[in-house]
């Protein structure tokens, strides 16, 4: 989990647009966030296995 101070800092609008970055909306993780789902890879995997993300299923071939 991310620190509360870092999550609060990320919510503020930065002075320059290039300073914006994505964070997972569920846990606050700053790395490996899928923009389409706004989730990090770990949260995405957990929710996908539970079937809570519509249209996503485990690949099998």
From Swiss-Prot:
Q: Which GO terms describe its cellular component?
A: small ribosomal subunit
> Example GO biological process term?
translation
Task: Name the residues that bind Zn(2+).
Answer: 24, 27, 40, 43
- One matching Pfam family, short form? Ribosomal_S14
Q: Which UniProt keywords apply?
A: Metal-binding, Ribonucleoprotein, Ribosomal protein, RNA-binding, rRNA-binding, Zinc
Q: Please share the entry's free-text remark on the cofactor.
A: Binds 1 zinc ion per subunit.
The cofactor named in the record is:
Zn(2+)
UniProt xrefs under PROSITE patterns = RIBOSOMAL_S14
Return one GO MF term: rRNA binding
Q: What quaternary structure, including any partners, is listed in this protein's UniProt entry?
A: Part of the 30S ribosomal subunit. Contacts proteins S3 and S10.
**Family statement:** Belongs to the universal ribosomal protein uS14 family. Zinc-binding uS14 subfamily.
Which function does this protein serve? Binds 16S rRNA, required for the assembly of 30S particles and may also be responsible for determining the conformation of the 16S rRNA at the A site.
What protein does this entry describe?
A: Small ribosomal subunit protein uS14
Organism, scientific name: Bacillus cereus (strain ATCC 14579 / DSM 31 / CCUG 7414 / JCM 2152 / NBRC 15305 / NCIMB 9373 / NCTC 2599 / NRRL B-3711)
Lineage per the UniProt record: Bacteria, Bacillati, Bacillota, Bacilli, Bacillales
